[in-house]
Curated annotation (Swiss-Prot):
Record keywords, A-Z: Cytoplasm, DNA replication, DNA-binding, DNA-directed DNA polymerase, Nucleotidyltransferase, Transferase
UniProt source species: Helicobacter pylori (strain J99 / ATCC 700824) (Campylobacter pylori J99)
Pfam family, one: DNA_pol3_beta
Subunit: Forms a ring-shaped head-to-tail homodimer around DNA which binds and tethers DNA polymerases and other proteins to the DNA. The DNA replisome complex has a single clamp-loading complex (3 tau and 1 each of delta, delta', psi and chi subunits) which binds 3 Pol III cores (1 core on the leading strand and 2 on the lagging strand) each with a beta sliding clamp dimer. Additional proteins in the replisome are other copies of gamma, psi and chi, Ssb, DNA helicase and RNA primase.
Protein name: Beta sliding clamp
Purpose of the protein: Confers DNA tethering and processivity to DNA polymerases and other proteins. Acts as a clamp, forming a ring around DNA (a reaction catalyzed by the clamp-loading complex) which diffuses in an ATP-independent manner freely and bidirectionally along dsDNA. Initially characterized for its ability to contact the catalytic subunit of DNA polymerase III (Pol III), a complex, multichain enzyme responsible for most of the replicative synthesis in bacteria; Pol III exhibits 3'-5' exonuclease proofreading activity.
Compartment(s) where it occurs, according to its Swiss-Prot or TrEMBL record: Cytoplasm
Main subcellular location of this protein, as a coarse class: cytoplasm
Entry's family note: Belongs to the beta sliding clamp family.
Keyword field contains DNA-binding: yes
Gene Ontology cellular-component terms listed: cytoplasm; DNA polymerase III complex
GO molecular function ontology, one term from the record: 3'-5' exonuclease activity
Entry keyword annotation includes tRNA processing: no
One BP term from GO: DNA strand elongation involved in DNA replication
Length: 374
């Protein structure tokens, strides 16, 4: 093959592909990027056994079609050092030659036929995403998922598809908290009325880098494939049964408080400078924040005024993990939030008020959280 390509287009695509390379074993075909020139397009692939990405860029000129491979890390290292002008890529015998002006680099290739095939699936479920609400849900739920969880089912995000009602539930948990949302009015095509899959967190994070809107999602139960005009991404799914999260959601709450999000974030941040756990006290006209630290004598306290006042007869105390509480608040797209509680020792819920409008492009996330024992 022999082509000329834009330096910027090539470099941007190579950066996307880095996450899919085996950088520990340079002798592995998985350390290489597969190149294929067809007419005026250069297709680039990187893959290991669990995850992969195929992208393309347009060539500036194509003198000869063909295939080749090149060490992905070294390829990016070279391209990123070159000037912002076109680059010539040419295969010669068992090497790939990179040229720009008076600079030339020659790197060995592997047998392109040994590169793993990009999977083609017969989907059991598929949907077209024309707005960023799914990516928004992934972004907001990602912090809740532990990638190294000893329970492999919890090392990913649960996606529950319901074809009858055209809804998609997205759920993540680390056993200390659980975040979930239900996306509605989406176009789901499925071979079954109810079907679910568990997407690994690693895959979720790569999807956030590559896709925003106008893409498709397909799954056959073992693999998931996500595609748009320039990228095709695949991942193995986590094989296992996700816990029935509906069973742990309280049926009702004895108390419900509507509170200012930014004021609470400020109070929690101030107290969390000394401790990761905080005692929250709600009174009729005030919210009090106090750091909890049993090992040292250090303390931090602050309070915020509740303008509208709470319908509360006596003070309500709650122990919270500062980091978890802040992440739950950051997932909300409203200026206020609702805190729903039962006993101080029972799980509590953080969600958006039903009567406050937010962008229809945002996912409405609810987070159930275990309290800290006071």
């Amino acid at each position: 093959m022999k082509i000329s390509v834009s330096k910027n287009d090539l470099e941007n695509t190579l950066r996307y592909l880095q996450a899919f390379l085996d950088k520990k074993d340079a002798s592995s075909i998985a350390s290489h990027i597969h190149l294929e020139v067809i007419k005026e397009k250069l297709f680039l692939k990187a893959s290991d056994s669990d995850i992969g990405l195929k992208s393309y860029i347009s060539t500036q000129s194509t003198d000869k079609e063909g295939v080749g491979t090149i060490n992905g890390k070294k390829f990016l290292d070279i391209i990123s050092c070159l000037k912002d002008s076109n680059i010539v890529l040419e295969t010669k015998d068992d090497s790939l030659v990179i040229k720009q002006n008076k600079s030339s680099f020659k790197l060995p290739m592997f047998d392109a036929d040994e590169f793993p095939e990009f999977p083609v699936i017969d989907p059991k479920v598929s949907l077209e995403i024309n707005a960023p609400f799914l990516v928004d849900a992934f972004k907001k739920i990602a912090p809740v998922i532990e990638q190294t969880s000893h329970k492999r089912e919890l090392a990913g995000v649960l996606m529950q598809f319901n074809q009858k009602h055209q809804t998609l539930s997205v759920v993540g948990t680390d056993t200390k908290r659980l975040s979930y949302t239900q996306l509605e009015k989406i176009s789901i095509h499925s071979t079954e009325e109810d079907i679910s899959c568990i997407l690994p967190k690693r895959a979720l994070l790569e999807i956030l880098k590559l896709f925003y809107e106008n893409f498709s999602f397909k799954s056959d139960g073992m693999l998931a494939v996500v595609e748009n005009e320039t990228h095709a991404f695949f991942t193995k799914l986590i094989d296992g049964n996700y816990p029935d999260y509906q069973k742990i959601l309280p049926k009702e709450y004895t108390s419900s408080f509507t509170l200012g999000k930014e004021e609470f974030k400020e109070g929690i941040k101030l107290c969390s400078s000394l401790s990761s756990t905080i005692k929250l006290t709600l009174e009729k006209n005030n919210a009090l924040f106090e750091s909890l630290d049993s090992e040292h004598s250090e303390t931090a306290k602050t309070s915020v005024e509740i303008e509208k006042g709470l319908d509360i007869e006596k003070a309500f105390h709650l122990g919270v993990n500062a980091k978890f509480f802040l992440e739950a608040l950051n997932a909300l797209g409203t200026t206020q939030f609702v805190l729903k509680c039962n006993e101080p020792s029972s799980p509590f819920l953080i969600q958006e008020p039903l009567d406050e409008k937010q962008s229809h492009l945002n996912a409405k996330i609810s987070t159930l959280m275990m309290p800290i024992t006071l």
